[in-house]
Amino acid sequence: MWGAIIKGDVEEVKQYLALGEDVNLRGLGNMTPLHRAAQNGRKEMVELLIENGADVNAMTDSGETPLDWAINSRHVKLYPQIRKHGGKTGEELKAE
């Protein structure tokens, strides 16, 4: 599924999800598919993953959320999209 997310192939990711692939699958550094989609600025992919149960506040080993990755990659269009689903930064979560 990782390759499809990086390519931005929404249809391929839909197929993986239909086959039962874990939307919150953990990769290197404990990142999730949503982290990678946010880092790559894939708005449609971000929405698909969230609609399928992606944890918007999943944290990497370094304490970063998908919103942090969108911010660090300067994908401004994703900030409100992730926020409307309850997404926070790692710092915000630590402060709670």
Predicted features and spans:
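Conserved ankyrin/ankyrin-like repeat signature
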Residues: 12, 44-45, 77-78
